[in-house]
Amino acid sequence: MSSSSNVTSLPRLTTAGGVFPREMVRVHSSCNILRSKAKVGGINYFNPGNIKCVEVHKSRQVAVAAVKSLEYETEKPTNQDVVSEKMRVLSERIGTMLQNMNEGEISISPYDTAWVALVEDTDGRPQFPTSLEWISNNQLADGSWGDRKFVIYDRILNTLACVVALTTWNMHPHKCNRGLRFIRDNIEKLENENEELMPIGFEVVFPSLIEAAQKLGIEIPHIDSPCIKKIQAMRDFKLKRIPMELLHKKPTSLLHSLEGMQGLVWEKLLDFRSDGSFLCSPSSTAYALQHTKDELCLQYLLKAVKKFNGGVPNVYPVDMFEHLWCVDRLQRLGICRYFRAQIKEMLDYVYKYWTDKGICWARNTNVQDVDDTAMGFRLLRMHGYDVSTDVFKQFEKAGEFCCFPGQSTHAITGMYNVYRTSQIMFDGEDILADAKNYSATFLHQKRLASELVDKWIITKDLPGEVGYALDVPFFASLPRLEARFFLEQYGGDDDVWIGKTLYRMPYVNSDTYLELAKLDYKKCQAVHQLEWKSIQKWYRDCKLGEFGLGEKRLLLAYFLAASTAFEPEKKGERLAWAKTAFLVETIASQQLSHEQKREFPNEFEHGSSLNMENGGRYKTRTRLVEILSNTVSQLSFETLVAEGRDIKQQLSNTWQKWLKTWEEGGNLGEAEAQLLLQTLHLSSGLDESSFSHPKYHQLLEATCKVCNQLRLFQNRKAHDAQGGISDLVIGTTFQIEASMQELVKLVFTKSSEDLDSITKQSFFAIARSFYYTAYCDAGAINSHIYKVLFENID
């Protein structure tokens, strides 16, 4: 058939560059596999599967114009511009928030404000009159003080503290009476409240507050009730366990609740201040100021009262906490790519104050906790900062881990973050291996007992967060899969933290983040759904179903690509990944004789060569070879248009290597990983010098090794399942985990002469996709595919 036969006329195409001349474009209408063909630099490029197929005999610019014009013709009108503008506004708003981060945005605590209001100046007057004013102005309609989230521990503690402060200064007796009425009507509810919702130190400070109220002549209703007696007994038990000599010997978490203690030796305790405060606690520091008149304590409180216009938070500053948890939320919501510069600044800030013992919620503190330390370690390591596992030593004793050294109880979220951190261990990091075993066991037990209620946060779906972490380990957690689940688990503005009182962190829990994340997800999902239709068309036009694999396998291939390289601008990489993976599986599934296998790569090689030499008129004897050749041409053409680079010969050579391995019965998992990686890198326009970089070869070797292990493991699982063996070991193997740890170390560590982070991450992305399919069962995978690609976001 001549190149001019069966050509239908095409109207002139209007492009951004003007009118596209009719004589430059011809549309073929009689091919089994429709083609667009562009002759650029003397080479014909085929594009199988297009609705309209263009043969262009001009420059690359002309080819680009034709493709863009045809794409424009098939676009449907959408509200894309409106959505894009909304996303731009939200991104700018969030960017401004992140740039303005300082010592932490946090809500005010009536309890701590009351303790500050109790401080006298040298003349016996209120040292902080604006704190009394804040109390007066912030009583709730029911007579209580506290967060809008009703937790009886929080409301009773805040309300009694404010009543004590106002009564001390003989102010607003009617407000005091309303507060006491609230206490009388609600105090017995303490009996039935979940103890996990009890604020930090409540059992110590609440009885002390009752005693202070009684000294003022305030009658506390139901003082002899069982719930009050129980709390007092808890206080006595805890104080007996506190070695006072230890309290005065070195900094401990007890510095946070000094207002609930007796017999303190202030001369010794003053040595434990940090930035003028006792563990960043305004109430504890105010109590110290009452007894010592210490100038540094005064300056700390003056600064806090000024910043918060009379009120004070339950803890301040919270800069390390805010920086880290903000980065974590942005990452898990899938929108961190919009804020790379700000995230680097935030992590640089954290690293500046990182210590060999870990960190706490604020910089320069003399006490560390495992929750902030684990979160910091995890994020810093994942972004290439050099951090040592020695920071966890003080939190471990005989294989058990605690939040503060010597503490016996655990918070769910503390162990949850230890567990998440333990999964990015490098080979040989035994303390993280111990942390993983301990935290995983703890979380599994809590889940089985339906006790996933945290003592540090009231969040929308903590059981869902913990369940996802346990069911989908880090090595299997595809980025878009994690984001899709977290969009449902993240509560935004409604999430509230538990400290000495309930408090909120607007730069950590934000509806603005959630709104942008949902818009971003919907935008990406819409792109993915259109691409899925186009790849289905490719499958049907090529009649690939005749080779034995259904669209379900194609959908899995596309899901893995779209869940990893999900950004709209990565269309070329997604389609190249999905089509390559599916063709690999299709070819490998064919029952061919040794002779047929030997002919296949030869025919592909000669067919590819002839296609380039004679305009594509060479007809291969094997239709599958023809489909492969045309797909390679299509992917090459699309990369030429997008990146301005001719990759056809390199892509053909990469396929030849895989076909040779397949023909010889070699390690197909290893060969497939190499094929996918090089296809991705070629399609993305990766600089050619990167392919010869020493680190590239290290990463390629490590990735191919673990992918081969995973594919063998997956095949064995499938074989065992077919044989009726159902009691498979949960997880993978020690060798696989060690190989993944080796790869993770190469990806997450930086060297003086290194590849860029995005390229290194692509190796982990391919390994992760192999791990995912090897680890997750078919039912889970099917539900994930539906959820990520097709389920609507509310």
Swiss-Prot record:
The transit peptide spans 1-35
The record's gene field reads CPS2
User: Which locations, inside or outside the cell, does it occupy?
Assistant: Plastid, Chloroplast
**Which protein are we looking at?**
Ent-copalyl diphosphate synthase 2
Disulfide links within the chain:
none
InterPro entries recorded: Isoprenoid_synthase_dom_sf, Terpene_synth_N, Terpene_synth_N_sf, Terpene_synthase-like, Terpenoid_cyclase/PrenylTrfase
Q: What role does it play?
A: Involved in the biosynthesis of ent-kaurene diterpenoids natural products such as oridonin, miltiradiene, eriocalyxin B and nezukol, known to exhibit antitumor, anti-inflammatory and antibacterial activities. Catalyzes the conversion of (2E,6E,10E)-geranylgeranyl diphosphate (GGPP) to ent-copalyl diphosphate (ent-CPP).
Instruction: Please give the cofactor(s) recorded in the UniProt entry for this protein.
Output: Mg(2+)
